[in-house]
């Protein structure tokens, strides 16, 4: 079995980008968000029980303990600009088919080819931070977020048993937050058995690969 540290250690440190989108692109994306809401909670979209949330994060429940939804509820809502390699809103297609981002992803993996798959946004209200670490952007041959529950794919990653079928993916994560309280990005450059690092707020138009 592959060790936990090697499974979760990033292939390279995050690359920080300033001005990820132009002011015009940002304005058009915000317009789509405002015109097409309301947006549902992330929890409602991806999980059917508190146990599935735990499987995605810590993966363990003490014997005799029953988790409840109120343990995980937070004001974090999600919508999609693009899914399954298709832009859902033509007016922001250039934001999705972003050649700058594709170049960064190819460079991150040392790959010849890359294709954009999904583009989503989160709207987050004030809430407690410091939740359990989790895995994003998992995909295996024939298994993706389009046909498989998120909690199951993340469990597959944590076992280390499916590495042969795991596909190479990267994310470009962008923030628009002018505050200085909270809002940072925690990551584990040496895997979960070592300490975390943080990219601190404010983060207006800042992105990481």
Language-model region placement:
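Hydrophobic alpha-helical segments, principally membrane-spanning helices and signal/leader peptides
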Residues: 7, 119-121, 156
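Hydrophobic alpha-helical segments and helix pairs
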Residues: 91, 97-111, 119
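Short, glycine/charge-rich beta-strand/loop segments that flank catalytic centers
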Residues: 48-49, 118-126
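Ordered hydrophobic segments in well-structured contexts
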Residues: 14-16, 120-122, 207-208
């Amino acid at each position: 079995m592959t060790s936990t540290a090697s499974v979760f250690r990033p292939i390279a440190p995050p690359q920080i980008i300033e001005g990820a989108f132009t002011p015009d692109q940002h304005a058009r994306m915000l317009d789509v968000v405002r015109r097409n809401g309301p947006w549902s909670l992330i929890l409602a979209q991806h999980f059917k029980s508190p146990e599935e949330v735990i499987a995605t994060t810590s993966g363990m429940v003490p014997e005799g303990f029953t988790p409840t939804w109120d343990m995980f509820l937070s004001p974090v809502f999600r919508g999609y600009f693009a899914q399954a390699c298709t832009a859902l809103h033509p007016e922001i297609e250039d934001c999705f088919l972003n050649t700058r981002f594709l170049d960064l992803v190819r460079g991150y993996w040392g790959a010849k080819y890359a294709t954009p798959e999904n583009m989503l946004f989160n709207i987050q209200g004030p809430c407690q931070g410091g939740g359990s670490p989790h895995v994003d952007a998992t995909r295996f041959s024939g298994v993706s977020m389009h046909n498989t529950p998120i909690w199951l794919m993340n469990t597959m990653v944590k076992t280390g048993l499916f590495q042969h079928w795991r596909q190479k993916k990267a994310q470009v994560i962008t923030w628009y937050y002018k505050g200085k309280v909270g809002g940072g990005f925690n990551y584990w450059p040496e895997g979960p058995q070592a300490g975390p690092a943080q990219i601190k707020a404010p983060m207006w138009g800042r992105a990481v690969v």
